[in-house]
């Protein structure tokens, strides 16, 4: 019993030491966060400079840089006592997306029904075959005197 009681008080300082990047109980310093997030944006812009512009829409070309950027914004938000994600950080990240990925919209293919000349046979043929096969089964089941 006593050894457990002795270990508990030592556990709290250890947890506090390990949680140096945890949000502070005093609240979020939004001004500090807005000052620190551009450092992450600049680092990301420098890394994206290594990627050809025409490859910016291919996530596999820069996923490591984007992960580093995301980790940086999370760390900077936590350092100033803010949770992540939060509206200010999301707004900053959205701005980075507009800067680098605004031309990466996916053109969705507008799907249309095929023309009636194609659609009608695609519907009628399976229906007719199903009715014909059901009729054949009924007809054969009535003729039990001969085997196939």
Swiss-Prot record:
Subcellular location: Cell membrane; Membrane
Membrane-traversing stretches: 114-138
Site residues, Required for CALCRL interaction: 113, 141
Gene3D superfamilies named in the record: Receptor activity modifying family (1.10.150.510)
GO molecular function: adrenomedullin receptor activity; amylin receptor activity; amyloid-beta binding; coreceptor activity
N-terminal signal peptide: 1-23
Keyword tRNA processing annotated: no
Stretches assigned to the Extracellular side: 24-113
Domain of life: Eukaryota
Cysteine disulfide links: 40-72, 57-104
Topology versus the membrane: Single-pass type I membrane protein
Side of membrane Cytoplasmic, spans: 139-148
Pfam family, one: RAMP
Any one GO cellular component localisation term in the record: adrenomedullin receptor complex
Function comment: Accessory protein that interacts with and modulates the function of G-protein coupled receptors including calcitonin gene-related peptide type 1 receptor (CALCRL), calcitonin receptor (CALCR) and G-protein coupled estrogen receptor 1 (GPER1). Required for the transport of CALCRL and GPER1 receptors to the plasma membrane. Plays a role in cardioprotection by reducing cardiac hypertrophy and perivascular fibrosis in a GPER1-dependent manner. Together with CALCRL, form a receptor complex for adrenomedullin/ADM and intermedin/ADM2. Together with CALCR, act as a receptor complex for amylin/IAPP.
Subunit organization: Heterodimer of CALCRL and RAMP3; interaction induces allosteric modulation of CALCRL function and ligand specificity for adrenomedullin/ADM and intermedin/ADM2. Heterodimer of CALCR and RAMP3; interaction form the receptor complex AMYR3 for amylin/IAPP. Interacts with GPER1.
Family designation: Belongs to the RAMP family.
Protein name: Receptor activity-modifying protein 3
Source organism: Homo sapiens
């Amino acid at each position: 019993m006593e050894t457990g009681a002795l270990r508990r008080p030592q556990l709290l300082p250890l947890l506090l030491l390990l949680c140096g990047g945890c949000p502070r109980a005093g609240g979020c310093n939004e001004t500090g966060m807005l000052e620190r997030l551009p450092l992450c944006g600049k680092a990301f812009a420098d890394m994206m400079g290594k990627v050809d512009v025409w490859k910016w829409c291919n996530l596999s070309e820069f996923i490591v840089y984007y992960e580093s950027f995301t980790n940086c914004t999370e760390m900077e938000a936590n350092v100033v006592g803010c949770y992540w994600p939060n509206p200010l950080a999301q707004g900053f990240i959205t701005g980075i997306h507009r800067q680098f990925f605004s031309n990466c919209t996916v053109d969705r293919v507008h799907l249309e029904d095929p023309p009636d000349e194609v659609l009608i046979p695609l519907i009628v043929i399976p229906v007719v075959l199903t009715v014909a096969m059901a009729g054949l089964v009924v007809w054969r089941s009535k003729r039990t005197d001969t085997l196939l």
